[in-house]
């Protein structure tokens, strides 16, 4: 064997990890300016955030959404005596652009009036799950185009806030059945609605019963343990998981308390301040959805829930693209009997998309 042509050692065949070099000795390079570039681009394009609120009528869903974003996002439509109760679940959504300190947020809120209000609630979750999957399908149809937009409009539901009635007992069979299906399709954040109707002791006991029900029935709500990326995430998310479901109170009216204006509900016993942790846990819900985990909710939606849907849909496709802008996402037809001619299976024709990514909200 030629001594000059030695076989490489196992250690040398491995890809070495890149070293971190400091530029301070050679002068300023400007790498940190990338953050400024990203900030300018993000502020120009704005952000998209889509939430869904699910729960029975009268639990304060509309008020809670308005309290979260301190805007009249949704007008409450409590059915009166002369307004007939809808016979089927109907989904409604509204889109607003909220701007704060130059940052624009395109917020879409989907409401589910009629959920759980009927005598027979069998499969009342089908329209909700169908709507969630429909948004995944829309995004997929845009994504698989050969010529597609640089910025695909995102209508996927990033978070579903599930309002639990303040019964003080445990989760109902309807809640358990629906949550088992819902948590596999979207990020779910359960909350105890109208928590001011419970005492502090009743609220804590109710929370522990709900946590036990979720664990017993293998319902994994957001933030999921399996998605903690590092030690800091584990510490923060563990504290959040200990408090879920949050006991919340919504209010969209201001009152004077000790010379200051506060959001709250006025009762004959006093004023319930929604921003006061001694009164309710609304600040924890707001911080989770907006201040600390908004981008993480979007990332998990894209990388986990949408990815699972995309894999299933692409596995159903058994044909390659046959032309520009065309993708077959229909399942393959069954094999034709011997001696007969197989008819072509149905296919969905994807339209060409126009590039309008430069448009702002």
UniProtKB/Swiss-Prot annotation:
Residue numbers spanned by region Self-association (via N-terminus) to polymerize octameric septin 12-7-6-2/4-2/4-6-7-12 filaments: 257-361
Region (Disordered): 333-361
Signal peptide: none
Subunit and interaction comment: Septins polymerize into heterooligomeric protein complexes that form filaments, and can associate with cellular membranes, actin filaments and microtubules. GTPase activity is required for filament formation. Interacts with SEPTIN6 and SEPTIN11. Component of a octameric complex consisting of SEPTIN12, SEPTIN7, SEPTIN6 and SEPTIN2 or SEPTIN4 in the order 12-7-6-2-2-6-7-12 or 12-7-6-4-4-6-7-12 and located in the sperm annulus; the octamer polymerizes into filaments via the SEPTIN12 N- and C-termini; the SEPTIN12:SEPTIN7 association is mediated by the GTP-binding domains.
Region (G4 motif): 193-196
Keywords for this protein: Cell cycle, Cell division, Cell projection, Cilium, Cytoplasm, Cytoskeleton, Differentiation, Flagellum, GTP-binding, Nucleotide-binding, Spermatogenesis
InterPro entries (alphabetical): G_SEPTIN_dom (IPR030379), P-loop_NTPase (IPR027417), Septin (IPR016491), Septin3 (IPR008114)
Broad class of where this protein is predominantly found: cytoplasm
Localisation: Cytoplasm; Cytoplasm, Cytoskeleton; Cytoplasm, Cytoskeleton, Spindle; Cell projection, Cilium, Flagellum
Stated role: Filament-forming cytoskeletal GTPase. May play a role in cytokinesis (Potential). Involved in spermatogenesis. Involved in the morphogenesis of sperm heads and the elongation of sperm tails probably implicating the association with alpha- and beta-tubulins. Forms a filamentous structure with SEPTIN7, SEPTIN6, SEPTIN2 and probably SEPTIN4 at the sperm annulus which is required for the structural integrity and motility of the sperm tail during postmeiotic differentiation.
PANTHER family: SEPTIN (PTHR18884)
Region (G1 motif): 55-62
Name of the protein this chain belongs to: Septin-12
Gene Ontology molecular function: GDP binding; GTP binding; GTPase activity; molecular adaptor activity; phosphatidylinositol binding
Ligand binding (GTP): 55-62, 88, 114, 194-202, 250, 265
UniProt GO cellular component terms: cell division site; cleavage furrow; microtubule cytoskeleton; midbody; perinuclear region of cytoplasm; septin complex; septin ring; sperm annulus
Chain ranges of the Septin-type G domain: 45-316
GO BP field: cell differentiation; cytoskeleton-dependent cytokinesis; protein localization; spermatogenesis
Biased composition (Low complexity): 338-347
Region (Interaction with SEPTIN7): 45-318
Family membership noted in the UniProt record: Belongs to the TRAFAC class TrmE-Era-EngA-EngB-Septin-like GTPase superfamily. Septin GTPase family.
Annotated SUPFAM superfamilies: P-loop containing nucleoside triphosphate hydrolases
The organism of origin for this protein: Bos taurus
